[in-house]
Curated annotation (Swiss-Prot):
It holds the Pfam family CobS. It comes from the Archaea. One of its GO terms (cellular component) is plasma membrane. This is Adenosylcobinamide-GDP ribazoletransferase.
């Protein structure tokens, strides 16, 4: 129970009293935190039919934690030197790269109109599952929460496969496109930084989620146009 509380405390904005840092149940991230965060977005979409409001609910449900990682990585990618780029990750000030990354991602996800409110749950299951699998094959460039996550993921990543299978079964074209584009982003940033940390994994979560929503919308529109 303690490790499950830690998953909720780390990946959502829900107040969890007495939660301690414990990644021994990191396998549950897609199914526990994913359902909670995705459920928040899905509920808002069901009530309002507004993609922007639904995506904002997703972000607020995470406490904007991963969005901050995306902004940090966006700034770091603007710096060519690896050591300077790593230092930029720790800088709380925002540069043009971080601002652009956040705005572009919000516009992409907020303009996507999925088939159903359930797609918000699926996209969060998928994004967290993909991050878990990718982390298992990554190397941290520094000690911290990211390195602890990576070490735990190396033992537990197979548990994420059912969540990926659900996303692939429901929207195969969107799954393929979002996965390829997300991995392209991750590999480019990983090589630039010489490894991974919590910011990069958080950025991957946000990028994957937005891309899946956008590609679900696009693939659905194309299929409806053809038939």
């Amino acid at each position: 129970m303690r490790c499950l509380k830690a998953v909720v405390a780390f990946f959502t904005a829900l107040p969890v009293g007495g939660a301690e840092l414990d990644f021994s149940c990191i396998w549950a991230t897609p199914y526990l935190a994913g359902l909670m965060v995705g459920g928040a977005g899905g509920a808002v979409y069901f009530l309002t039919h507004s993609p922007a409001a639904a995506y904002a609910a997703l972000l607020l449900a995470t406490g904007l934690h991963h969005l901050d990682g995306l902004a940090d990585v966006g700034d770091a990618l603007m710096v060519r030197d690896r050591e300077r780029a790593r230092r930029v990750l720790e800088d709380p000030r925002r540069g043009v790269g971080g601002i652009f990354a956040v705005v572009a991602l919000f516009v992409l996800a907020a303009s996507a109109r999925p088939e159903s409110w359930l797609d918000y749950i699926v996209t969060d299951l998928y994004s967290k599952a993909l991050a878990l699998v990718v982390a298992a094959y990554s190397k941290p460039f520094k000690e911290g929460l990211g390195s602890l996550f990576i070490v735990s993921a190396k033992r537990q990543w197979p548990a994420a496969l059912p969540a990926l299978a659900v996303a692939a079964w429901l929207h195969p074209a969107a799954f393929l496109a979002a996965t390829v584009l997300s991995l392209f982003f991750y590999v480019a940033a990983y090589k630039h930084l010489g490894g991974a940390n919590g910011d990069l994994l958080g950025a991957l979560l946000e990028v994957t989620r937005a891309l899946y929503l956008a590609t679900v919308d696009l693939s659905t529109s194309l299929i409806n146009g053809l038939f």
